[in-house]
């Protein structure tokens, strides 16, 4: 058996099934939010974990998961983020989306590509760059944002959140341009 990937930070997940999946894939400790009604005691746990070992927020690639990510991120600054593409988190019968459905390989890959929040960073990528790239409004915008989020490993979001994440994770103009070029090439096929 291969040596298990050891994670120093404490991983914030949504529930027990996510913890089981994480521990199956890597050697790590978790904090469970148990849904999107996050109690103050959970926020306090996450704050303490952030001070002692650091925190990686690893929630499901769906609306409740993004909501939980935002709540924790707002209340506990400086967290790291791991993202799982939606198609790697689908249940076998396509009923449900979650980390608990992901393969060990997908979980490890997401944890190898974590992003760190940077406070008060004015990024290189402007709102007009997103508009010019067809990522805001228009019939191709959603699918382009999905692809860009996957290529840049920052998850799928709406246009406003995409802009915020590009800033927060200090995505360079070069990385953005490379990903955009790939999206356009794929569309031509």
Swiss-Prot record:
Binding site for Mg(2+) 2: 60, 62
Name of the featured protein: Ribonuclease M5
GO biological process assignments: rRNA processing
Binding site for Mg(2+) 1: 14, 60
Cofactor note: Binds two Mg(2+) per subunit.
Location (main, coarse): cytoplasm
Enzyme class: hydrolase
Reactions performed catalytically: Endonucleolytic cleavage of RNA, removing 21 and 42 nucleotides, respectively, from the 5'- and 3'-termini of a 5S-rRNA precursor
Cellular location(s): Cytoplasm
The species this protein was found in: Bacillus cereus (strain ATCC 14579 / DSM 31 / CCUG 7414 / JCM 2152 / NBRC 15305 / NCIMB 9373 / NCTC 2599 / NRRL B-3711)
Lineage: superkingdom: Bacteria
Family, per entry: Belongs to the ribonuclease M5 family.
